[in-house]
């Protein structure tokens, strides 16, 4: 993996399009302002969007694939400060461009596991899910919309606004009432297509071959819209409510 360095701020539209304009990050948490030229600029809330922009703008996609990059950078989100969540934080990340096989997903997960092991961080467990692809996700989205519509009066204002545009985001809401409703929502693994199922099973086989234990958690969707197929989180039981210490996934 080669180091990549990206600006601390980007055009706001980059995050609106990639992270998703119905996510908490874009709706509530970004630090956004207009520069002297009247352009909307945002401090980066995460590292992937800027890395992908740089990958495309600087022609890395014209070089031999896969391209593997890593970064360590500061990010900014207007969150309620608490254990494990500060408004300025550092994110270490890796991106693997141009690798479509399940082995690439397992490689990234294995790298994270090795990093934690080398740092002596214990008591983490890996949770894994697939959120499907553009081919199969519309059926799941329709099922979610039907389910949450029957609870619309109970949802928070933000989730009601997401009901028509992106009901999957409701699964990521931290409101206790919305979380309780989401607990009984349809699960995505009942809707994924055969190709996504094969990919997900392949990731599991590679992790088993590497000796990496995991549990399937069909409720993981991550908080950003660009993910497809594999999503994962490393979770700790030792740091309180905000238990996810590492997360990621595929974005085809």
Segments predicted by a language model, with ranges:
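TRNA-recognition modules of translation machinery and tRNA-sensing kinases, especially anticodon-binding
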Residues: 1-252
């Amino acid at each position: 993996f080669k180091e990549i360095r990206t600006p601390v701020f980007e055009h706001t539209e980059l995050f609106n399009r990639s992270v998703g304009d119905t996510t908490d990050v874009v709706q509530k948490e970004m630090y956004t302002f207009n520069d002297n030229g009247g352009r909307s600029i945002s401090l980066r809330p995460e590292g992937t969007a800027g890395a992908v922009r740089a990958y495309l703008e600087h022609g890395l996609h014209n070089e031999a694939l896969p391209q593997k990059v890593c970064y360590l950078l500061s990010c900014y989100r207007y969150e309620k400060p608490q254990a494990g969540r500060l408004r300025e934080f550092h994110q270490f990340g890796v991106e693997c461009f141009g690798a479509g096989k399940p082995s690439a997903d397992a490689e990234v997960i294995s790298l994270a596991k090795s990093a934690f092991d080398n740092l002596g961080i214990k008591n983490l467990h890996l949770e894994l899910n697939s959120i499907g692809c553009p081919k199969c996700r519309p059926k799941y989205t329709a099922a979610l919309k039907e389910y949450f519509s029957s609870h619309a009066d109970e949802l928070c204002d933000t989730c009601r606004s997401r009901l028509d545009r992106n009901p999957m985001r409701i699964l990521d809401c931290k409101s206790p009432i919305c979380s309780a409703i989401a607990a009984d929502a349809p699960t995505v693994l009942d809707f994924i297509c055969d190709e996504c199922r094969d990919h997900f099973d392949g990731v599991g086989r590679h992790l088993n071959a590497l000796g990496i234990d995991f549990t399937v958690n069909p409720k993981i969707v991550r908080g950003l819209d660009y993910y497809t197929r594999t999503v994962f989180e490393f979770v700790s039981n030792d740091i309180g409510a905000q238990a996810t210490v590492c997360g990621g996934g595929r974005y085809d």
